[in-house]
Amino acid sequence: MSRQDVQRLLEEYQVINELLATLQAQHTTVSELLEELTTALDGVRLLKTEGGERLVHIGAGLFVLGTFNAREVLTPLGAGYHAFLDLENAERILKERIDEYSKVKTSLEENIEKLIERAAQIRQVLERLGIK
């Protein structure tokens, strides 16, 4: 293996590690968003059940106790626009978003796995050549 080949492998290894860091950060963001969407979906489903008091998280670890008769929720539509939607449509939109982001998460996981495998291959070659 020529010096240039070794240099290319080292450069590829560095690029792969940078890509891995970026994809892992994106994976974390998507995972957090999925958790938030799932929490929102649970909230909409709770609103669909009748009666009873509920604790509602209002931020910074604070909760308020309340009784809700809401049949609509203010839902983000994108581009800064919001609309009041009935609970059924809000639930449908949340499910669609969860499906979309689940696919993105799966794709990220597949790409991360491929990059990890390639990095391991390069590392093995470099170690055989005595380069760490």
From Swiss-Prot:
HAMAP family in alphabetical order: PfdA
Keyword Cytoplasm listed: yes
Keywords: Chaperone, Cytoplasm
Organism, scientific name: Pyrobaculum islandicum (strain DSM 4184 / JCM 9189 / GEO3)
Chief subcellular location: cytoplasm
Membrane spanning residue stretches: none
Assembly and oligomerization: Heterohexamer of two alpha and four beta subunits.
Cellular localization per UniProt: Cytoplasm
Pfam families per UniProt: Prefoldin
Keyword set includes Transmembrane: no
Highest taxon of the lineage: Archaea
GO cellular component: cytoplasm; prefoldin complex
GO BP terms in the entry: protein folding
Cited function: Molecular chaperone capable of stabilizing a range of proteins. Seems to fulfill an ATP-independent, HSP70-like function in archaeal de novo protein folding.
Family, per entry: Belongs to the prefoldin subunit alpha family.
Protein name: Prefoldin subunit alpha
Gene Ontology MF annotations: unfolded protein binding
